[in-house]
Structures are given as structure tokens and as C-alpha cells.
Amino acid sequence: IRKEAGIVGMGGATFPTHVKLAPPPDKKVDTVILNGAECEPYLTSDHRLMLEYPENVVFGLQALMKALGVKKGYIGIETNKPDAIEKVFEAAKDVADIEVVALKTKYPQGAEKQLIYACTGREVPSGGLPADAGVVVNNVGTAAAVAKAIKTGMPLIERIVTVTGAGVN
């Protein structure tokens, strides 16, 4: 469904999700990590998503784990978002093999290699990809898009956008 629904990475790169879910046979992936760090100033779309649709984030992670045949999932969220940590933890509390990780608030905590290390203690080899450490990383928005596609059959045609700063009252 991820391919037919046009699901792409919602963290910014728009990499096709179905490609991430088909690692080379020599890469033994056993973990999926969702990136909820959103460490760039003024960006709050992922934060709002985790507050308003935490169940979709968790459901999407379960679907990604099932697609890859893995048993372990993490959702990494920086500690400057305690409300999001609480909401996502509540949504995931009864789901086996999913752990919400409170990440130290620092830049660039949301970068793939830092996120993988913070959640699993594994290091991605220099010049390597997350699959070299047995991990696939997706954004929380990507997981929510997967959930929406599964639940409604709707392709990816929209995303959450936030507006912030001095010009907003």
C-alpha cells in the first residue's frame, strides 16, 4: 500500500518509503526508528502531529515493522516536547516491542546517525547507511501517512503545516 499510496519520507527528503522498506538481502534489518526529534528552530509540524494523532504514529510504526518483518521499534522524541512524549507513550503503552525514547535536546539529534545511536547504541559505519546497523529510520509524519493510507485508502496528498514567528498573533 505504501507504493500505491505514494508514501514518501515526510521529514523533508521525500525519499520513496517503499524503497526504504526493501533493504538489500545482505542487510539484516531488525529495528525501525521513528524520528520525532524535529530539532530545527521554528519547525513544529511533527510536534503537532504527535500531539493530535499519536495513535496514527504508533499504528504506522506497527505497519512499518510488519512490512520489514522486525520485532523492535523506537520513537525518538526530544525532551523539549514533554507533551508529545506523554501522548505518544500513552498511545504505545500497550503495544509490545515499541519503545518511546526521550532524547536529549541538542542539535543535530534528529540526524539519522545520531538518532540511531541515541535509541539503540549502534553506530552506522562511516560512509554506511542505517541498514548497515540493522535499522530503517522514518519520520513520525511518514508513519502517520502510512497509517492514514491503510485506514482510509487515501494516497499521500496532504501534510501538516505549521506557521510560527513574530508575524503570527
Which role fits each region the language model picked out?
Residues 1-116:
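Iron-sulfur-cluster electron-transfer modules
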Residues 71-169:
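Hydrophobic alpha-helical positions that pack around
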